[in-house]
């Protein structure tokens, strides 16, 4: 069965009872004796989907129940509409495959993390709710701005970036001045004007 992105499920929810396959990582994993819940996200949209898994349907129930946050899964199951719940639908799992376990040493945890702490792991920040939302807003704002100017006949040009850093001799390629560097005009105090 072909993988379905969560964003497409939220845009056009299939009929109740439709079989779907989704992949993603666990935002939360909760379980009791016979039933468990995974909040699964795939990065295609902000909202996760709730996966319901039951001990009598899955041989690997105990393995799944022990999985930590950010473990990646492939889930095949039945989409069930839930109009009276917080989410519009959930997926009752028929099979769950653990694609990649995630141990307790993984730096992102369910507890609140400070911005200073997240700054040390820039490659993982998009997985947090705060940065995920901020990047989506920035992406939509940039798209709207580019679309507006494009529709009004403007051309987007990638201009060179001038910086004060001279890394590995890159600044020797060209100079950004019209002055003769061998004979720079100086003011009365001897400084460059």
Indicate where each model-derived feature is located.
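Class II aminoacyl-tRNA synthetase catalytic cores and aaRS-like
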Residues: 1-193
């Amino acid at each position: 069965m072909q993988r379905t992105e969560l964003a497409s499920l939220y845009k056009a929810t299939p009929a109740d009872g439709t079989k779907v396959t989704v992949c993603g990582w666990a935002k939360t994993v909760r379980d009791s004796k016979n039933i468990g819940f995974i909040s699964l996200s795939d990065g295609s949209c902000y909202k996760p989907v709730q996966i319901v898994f039951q001990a009598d349907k899955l041989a690997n129930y105990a393995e799944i129940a022990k999985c930590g946050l950010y473990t990646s899964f492939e889930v095949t199951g039945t989409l069930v509409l839930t109009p009276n719940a917080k989410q519009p639908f959930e997926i009752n799992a028929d099979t769950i495959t653990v694609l990649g376990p995630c141990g307790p040493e993984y730096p992102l945890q369910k507890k609140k993390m400070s911005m200073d702490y997240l700054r040390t792991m820039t490659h993982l920040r998009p997985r947090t709710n705060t940065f995920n939302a901020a990047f989506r807003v920035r992406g939509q704002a940039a798209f709207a701005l580019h679309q507006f100017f494009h529709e009004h006949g403007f051309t987007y040009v990638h201009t060179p970036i001038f910086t004060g850093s001279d890394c590995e001799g890159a600044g020797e390629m060209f100079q950004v001045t019209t002055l003769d560097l061998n004979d720079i005009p100086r003011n009365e105090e001897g400084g460059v004007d």
